[in-house]
């Protein structure tokens, strides 16, 4: 098992010019991280496997002695209103195939992509059932393409619609490919009003990659600045330093250890705290859970 950091966790420092991707790698190494998950949104976008930055980033990671663990990108197989659904899905699948080639150029064996986004009011179970088969076909095609590179693709439990552990489990089982799994974020289940301990227990058997995130969970009916609603809108959430929130991370870690999972674990921090200090505290707290 290797514990490291998603570059997304350092987005604010990167956007403010305090870090770039190369100093982020050095920072992750300096706080005891063993890998960096590549999140292009935080470090720029990549449109070609021949982008010279890829080799530069690979060399920087190798020189620092940390792995590049996963390539994490956005996607949405569902069309916008008025858009042709079949044509949109075809274009999105082809775009993701190009991103698979970029992941392969980075030398990673894991790639997470989103599958579907809808506003909260359109994320009912009936709507999920209506969208499921459409999304399954797209995920299967991307996974089949990734197989030639030895890459496992995955869906993360986020974005409200394909977020609860049952929905994620059904998607993975229906795609029915050995190289399509889930990037399991232990904190994100709260967004779907789900207990993280129960959800981790449900999804650990299909996890190829794990995010450790923590949340403050409140039952307030009013959503103040900095918080966001759960799917039911009955609770509100705010990201925080891993180990400082309300997710039962200790029990989640116990389930993960008992499962025999021996892959990568990424700190994914998205709270208001200063990100560099927050990430350092987070990685120390998660290491203690797995000591």
Predicted regions and their residues:
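Glycine-rich, proline-tolerant flexible connector loops at the mouths of alpha/beta enzymes
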Residues: 37-58, 115-121
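Hydrophobic faces of well-ordered beta-strands that scaffold small-molecule active sites
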Residues: 3-7, 36-38, 68-73, 111-113, ...
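Boundary/entry segment of secreted carbohydrate-active catalytic domains
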Residues: 1-20
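Active-site acidic/histidine proton-transfer and metal-coordination neighborhood
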Residues: 59-67, 79-182
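Catalytic domains of carbohydrate-active enzymes, especially glycoside hydrolases
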Residues: 20-41, 107
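Active-site beta-loop-alpha junctions enriched in small/polar residues
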Residues: 8-10, 39-41, 73-76, 116-118, ...
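Acidic/histidine-rich catalytic cores of soluble enzymes
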Residues: 35-36, 136-246
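Short, acidic/polar
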Residues: 15-28, 90-100, 192-200, 249-252
């Amino acid at each position: 098992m290797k514990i490291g950091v998603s570059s997304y966790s350092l987005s604010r420092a990167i956007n403010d010019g305090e870090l770039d991707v190369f100093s982020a790698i050095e920072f992750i190494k300096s706080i005891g991280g063993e890998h960096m998950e590549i999140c292009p949104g935080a470090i720029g976008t990549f449109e070609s496997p021949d982008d010279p930055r890829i080799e530069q980033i690979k060399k920087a990671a190798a020189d620092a002695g940390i792995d590049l663990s996963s390539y994490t990108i956005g996607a949405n197989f569902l069309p916008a209103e008025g858009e042709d659904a079949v044509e949109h899905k075809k274009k999105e699948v082809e775009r993701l195939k190009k991103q698979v080639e970029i992941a392969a150029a980075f030398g990673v064996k894991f790639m997470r992509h989103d599958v579907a986004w809808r506003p909260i009011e359109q994320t009912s179970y009936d709507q999920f059932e209506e969208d499921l088969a459409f999304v399954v076909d797209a995920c299967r095609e991307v996974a089949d393409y990734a197989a030639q590179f030895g890459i496992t693709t995955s869906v993360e439990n986020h974005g409200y619609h394909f977020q609860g552990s049952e929905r994620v489990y059904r998607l993975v089982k229906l795609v029915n490919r050995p190289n399509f799994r889930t990037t399991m974020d232990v904190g994100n289940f709260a967004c779907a009003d789900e207990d993280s301990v129960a959800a981790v227990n449900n999804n650990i058997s299909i996890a190829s990659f794990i995010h450790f995130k923590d949340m403050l969970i409140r039952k307030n009916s009013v959503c103040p600045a900095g918080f966001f609603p759960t799917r039911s809108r009955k609770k509100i959430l705010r990201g925080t330093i891993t180990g400082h929130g309300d997710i039962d991370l200790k029990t989640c870690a116990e389930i993960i250890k008992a499962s025999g999972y021996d892959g990568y674990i990424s700190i994914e921090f998205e709270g208001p705290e200063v990100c560099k200090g927050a990430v350092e505290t987070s990685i120390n707290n998660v290491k203690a859970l797995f000591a």
